[in-house]
Regions:
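A short, surface-exposed loop/turn module that caps and links secondary-structure elements
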Residues: 33-60
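Enriched for short, Lys/Arg-rich terminal
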Residues: 1-3, 9-25, 29, 50, ...
Length: 90
C-alpha cells in the first residue's frame, strides 16, 4: 500500500473540484486503486506524460477531469500533483 502525498497545487485544484460538484466517489475509486498498486481500467486512459510533466502519469477520472500523479516505488509514495480539466492543467 502506498502512502499519499498531495502537493500544495493539488490542494488548490481540489478546492475547485469540490466547488464544481464533481462526483468525488469516482476520484476515491481511482485513488484506492492507485494506493493499492492495482492497474487502472482502460476507461481511465492512464498514460505517461512528457514535457513539463515528464516522469509523471495522467488518468481520466471523467472525460474532462484529469489526475496527474507519480509513484515513487523506492519510498512507496503516491504523489498527487494536479487535478482538473484539460484547460485547467494545460
Amino acid at each position: 500500500m502506498l502512502k499519499v502525498k498531495m502537493t500544495s497545487q493539488f490542494k488548490k485544484d481540489w478546492k475547485k473540484i469540490v466547488k464544481r460538484n464533481c462526483d468525488i466517489k469516482k476520484f476515491e475509486k481511482v485513488l484506492s486503486l492507485l494506493i493499492n498498486e492495482q492497474s487502472l481500467d482502460e476507461k481511465y486512459k492512464d498514460h505517461k506524460l512528457i514535457g513539463d510533466y515528464n516522469g509523471c502519469r495522467e488518468c481520466h477520472i471523467e472525460p474532462d477531469w484529469l489526475l496527474i500523479y507519480y509513484i515513487e516505488n523506492d519510498i512507496l509514495t503516491l504523489t498527487l500533483l494536479r487535478t482538473g480539466t484539460h484547460s485547467d492543467l494545460f
